[in-house]
Amino acid sequence: MTAQDSIPSLEQLVQQKRVKEEKAARPKFLSKAERARLALERRQKEVEEAKAKQNDKLLDLRKRTFTNHLENNELADDEKKSQVSSVSSNNSGTESSATDEAFSMTIRQRYMGIKPPVVKKRRRNADKKFVFDWDATDDTMKDAETSASPEATIAVFGRGKLGGFDDQSIRKAKSNSGLIQRLLQGTEQDKARAHELIQLQEKRAKKIDWDDVPWREKPLEAMKPRDWRILKEDYNISIKGDDLPNPLRNWEEAGLPSEMLKVLKKVNYKEPSSIQRAAIPVLLQRKDLIGIAETGSGKTAAFIIPLIIAISKLPPLTESNMHLGPYAVVLAPTRELAQQIQVEGNKFAEPLGFRCVSVVGGHAFEEQSFQMSQGAHIVVATPGRLLDCLERRLFVLSQCTYVVMDEADRMLDMGFEDDVNKILSSLPSSNASEKDGSILATANSSSSRRQTIMFSATLPPRVANLAKSYLIEPVMLTIGNIGQAVDRVEQRVEMISDDSKKWRRVEEILESNRFSPPIIIFVNLKRNIEAIAKQLNAIGWHAVTLHGSKSQEQRERAIEQLRNKTADILVATDIAGRGIDIPNVSLVLNYNMAKSIEDYTHRIGRTGRAGKSGTAITFLGPEDTDVYYDLRVLLSRSAKAHIPDELRNHEAAFVRHAAITQ
């Protein structure tokens, strides 16, 4: 290598400088510990610089003070020397001349009134400044601090006061400590109170900052409006109304009677669902409510629990008032849903001494009249059958103060609107809101004002008009999105049009062993239900059927077999799509697509209930183009749904069918 090669060129130097500048300008990542260390070093450096400046100022002050002192001493010495020199010079003259001069001056001052000259006192420069530096030997408090206790030091300022003011913290600590000592020497109740005071003092000493603690870990008194908003967001709760209570965090904070808490523990209700968290506090305040919630959300317990608590505060049913009818009426669109509500209601009613009776079609009037004669606190009925019983005078609703309409949208779709209006109009206390406000004022002032509750999966205009007619200032409660399927359900759509291909696909799904009983298969036509059930029985599955042509006894037996796991598969029409609660349904198979997206939503809502996951498989064909658009929109909103390309790209999936027909 030559000497010229070892010497870098100008371009290399410029390149190296550019690289260094880029490297210096590039931000350097520092960890949290390094940032803390650098901040601490900067702080220490600032403190040291401040101390150095203070020491320099102090040293300069001392130097200037010492210099002034020396100057004053030198000036005083010069004055003394001048006086001595003048005296000595006078002495060197003749004593007679000095005496004569002094004598003549004295005579002039005496007879002529001449005042003697005033000699101005010269002020020293050192007197203008105050030195704040004290010597250590000047400190007189050391002996007092070592010889006297803090209590004695404070006591010298008066009767328990410090400088004329009470030391509140010391006085409170003394009083609390004395109280705790006295309580610890008392009874067991006093000792418990003492331990509470000790815990309270420990909490105050800790001074926990609850702002950064999640709402689940906070005590109830530490909850702030922000925490309640987060709770509502976590459970998809949207509520509108006046003077609304906060949702429930758990059963223990709900303020329920101890007997009800025991029942909840017995039926294994560990935590309230979303609608139970929001609806129960509202209903306990005797407010009217419109609840819009997804299927399988626990609506039944949401109104049964407050209903039973309210009934427990009314006079007990005896022979003197039993003929006046029940205290509460629950309306359901189908027999199966009514009987299911009765079963769920008796879980809470029977342990507390109340009776819940169902009045549905398929049973003799005499049988239901006998049940009512025994006394019933709650009646669960279908609108048609209840209206027949009222018209036949089998029982009355003279003391009914609670009305619940479950699946209100389904009741109106099934043509029960007139029956519902007649039933509500026949009740003793009307909640119909009139413009003059007289009924409203009377209802609010009366202790027997009727409380009306309406639950629905959707809110069509007819349901809104019904609520407007019979509910007073209702609270509007929405859980999730209206008309949305449960997020725990995995939705799959398969494009199959031929019945033979559908059946082969059913066999493949069942033989995959991915889904365990119970399983529900929905079919649109009743004549196809029995054929599919026979084919299922032929390949080794125990299938039962449910449709409108079945008697009430056959319906109840089919559902009971599926619940008891004596049957594996239920083949049904949309009659089983709403309100039927069969636990642990792993698969809902839509052999035929539902005629509306609402019915589809309720069908797949039979699985994924009570916090568990489920699967819904739908066979889609060309005859279902009317629901392509709504189905595509519904599937696109779910994170657990798969949309096949045939559906996504189909022309009918981009325009709503109602818009085309118009």
From Swiss-Prot:
Enzymatic reactions: ATP + H2O = ADP + phosphate + H(+)
Domain Helicase ATP-binding: 280-477
GO biological process: cis assembly of pre-catalytic spliceosome; mRNA splicing, via spliceosome
Motif (DEAD box): 406-409
UniProt GO molecular function: ATP binding; ATP hydrolysis activity; mRNA binding; RNA helicase activity
Intracellular or extracellular location(s): Cytoplasm; Nucleus
Protein's job: ATP-dependent RNA helicase involved in mRNA splicing. May destabilize the U1/5'-splice site duplex to permit an effective competition for the 5'-splice site by the U6 snRNA, resulting in the switch between U1 and U6 at the 5'-splice site. May also act to unwind the U4/U6 base-pairing interaction in the U4/U6/U5 snRNP, facilitating the first covalent step of splicing.
Subunit details: Component of the U5 snRNP complex.
Name this polypeptide is given: Pre-mRNA-splicing ATP-dependent RNA helicase prp28
Native source species: Schizosaccharomyces pombe (strain 972 / ATCC 24843)
Protein's gene: prp28
